[in-house]
Amino acid sequence: MKLKPIEVAEILQKEIANINCLSELEEVGQVITVGDGIAQIYGLANVKSGEVVEFKSGVKGLVLNLENDSVGAVIMGDDNQVQQGDNVKRTKAVLEVPVGKALLGRVVDALGNPIDGKGDIASKEYRHIEMKAPGIIERTSVSEPVQTGIKAIDSLIPIGRGQRELIIGDRQTGKTAIAVDTIINQKQAHSLTNESDKIYCIYVAIGQKRSSVAQIVKKLEDAGAMDYTLIVSATASEAAALQFIAPYSACSMGEYFRDNGMHALIIYDDLSKHAVAYRQISLLLRRPPGREAYPGDVFYLHSRLLERAAKMSEEKGSGSLTALPIIETQAGDVSAYIPTNVISITDGQIFLESELFYKGVRPAVNVGISVSRVGSAAQIKAMKQVAGSVKLELAQFRELESFSQFGSDLDPATKAQIDHGKRLVEILKQAQYHPFPVEEQIVSIYVGTKKYLNDVPLQKVKEFEDKMLTEIRLNKKDILESIKNEQRITEETEQKLKAFLENFVKEFVK
């Protein structure tokens, strides 16, 4: 049987097409020096900044420095597995992490690998860790509230969806407690079917102790909040490179919800340790140090992260990503380098004071210097009705209180104002892990501002509040329902509330 030349050519072409080409061109370099989580690599002429490289042992590295004759890479893992003279190959890829609802309820590391022992994560979608922040046209102004469940915050320093609100204070003043309470408070919204009410939460632990992270996971599990929460952990024992990339990875996970018309809340705990990790990397890469030995681009480090929190426009699906960065100060010094940087990037700050904390005012929010620059637009009308005067009254009380230390004889009006202020401070106190629904907060603050507590002894204010709320939940549920559904206090509801409170105060004082 003779084959025609055309048929021979066709057969050969088919055979050639079916051959799997095994030889691939790889760009390979060599490790010149390695130590302290940094590798200097020679021979990768075309490598790009931010590209992932792979060492002989399988450990990955991230290229940060491009020099004349070598590149500097941070090692994302154990640097003991990288030796001088090892081969390093380009991957021609940037860092990506898994995103999606499959991550909810899980604890992952900075690269999105599960570390909770519950098996693999079945995520179909991956995103780059460094994404461009949405532009001005893609955004819309903040208009919906994020209810933290904390009276002092929801009434005086309200937070809106898409806002960046800094939580700042010394160590052990309750910064993480505010963040965890906010996560727990979202449980009520997740029990409803309406997707637009739900806020998915992401907690990023940067440079924390493992025991602290385990404690937070346990607390959230006990409260039933892990179902809608994801924890990204880069603890103090991990490489500085992982602590540096953890917030960016977590932000990409949060952007998945934002870009799909859902709402997410991300907590960075804390960005002081993040800046320290970046300073360590920069100094080891021999970049010139600036103020407090931080590199020159430490502002950009945080601004490019926090600018990714946004409220998206209707055309973009109306999703939002709200950021609560945490900064730890040293001896209340808010004017240090990193605190001032982050204050200038964010839309307001909640300032926690150790002095108030030790006095037993918890949450220890200093109302005088805490602000929310955009959140008041998101506050519900009922809260505006009752909380409008609280900030002024508290400021006047603080002034009179410091003034009254110098003189013992006070006129009755001043004395009454100080007593009223003390009761306001008392009603804003709250136990940890006990967030209040917004309608109950409104009733509590109404009681404080309308001077129903004047006849109640100061040490019994807390007891009064507990009993009053229990009574209203059992017998006057219609008042709470009306505030919740109407989002304002109608005249009819106010009459009912006044009648109930007058009777309750009489009974209680007896």
From Swiss-Prot:
Predominant location category: membrane
Catalytic activity of the protein: ATP + H2O + 4 H(+)(in) = ADP + phosphate + 5 H(+)(out)
GO CC terms in record: plasma membrane; proton-transporting ATP synthase complex
Subcellular location(s) of the protein: Cell inner membrane
Residues given in the record as ATP binding sites: G169, D170, R171, Q172, T173, G174, K175, T176
GO molecular function: ADP binding; ATP binding; proton-transporting ATP synthase activity, rotational mechanism
EC number(s) stated in the UniProt entry for this protein: 7.1.2.2
Keywords (A to Z) from UniProt: ATP synthesis, ATP-binding, Cell inner membrane, Cell membrane, CF(1), Hydrogen ion transport, Ion transport, Membrane, Nucleotide-binding, Translocase, Transport
Membrane topology: Peripheral membrane protein
Sites marked Required for activity: S370
Pfam families assigned: ATP-synt_ab, ATP-synt_ab_C, ATP-synt_ab_N
Xref: PANTHER family: ATP SYNTHASE SUBUNIT ALPHA, MITOCHONDRIAL (PTHR48082:SF2)
NCBIfam families membership: atpA, PRK13343.1
Family: Belongs to the ATPase alpha/beta chains family.
Subunit structure: F-type ATPases have 2 components, CF(1) - the catalytic core - and CF(0) - the membrane proton channel. CF(1) has five subunits: alpha(3), beta(3), gamma(1), delta(1), epsilon(1). CF(0) has three main subunits: a(1), b(2) and c(9-12). The alpha and beta chains form an alternating ring which encloses part of the gamma chain. CF(1) is attached to CF(0) by a central stalk formed by the gamma and epsilon chains, while a peripheral stalk is formed by the delta and b chains.
Function as written in the Swiss-Prot or TrEMBL entry: Produces ATP from ADP in the presence of a proton gradient across the membrane. The alpha chain is a regulatory subunit.
Protein name: ATP synthase subunit alpha
Gene expressing this chain: atpA
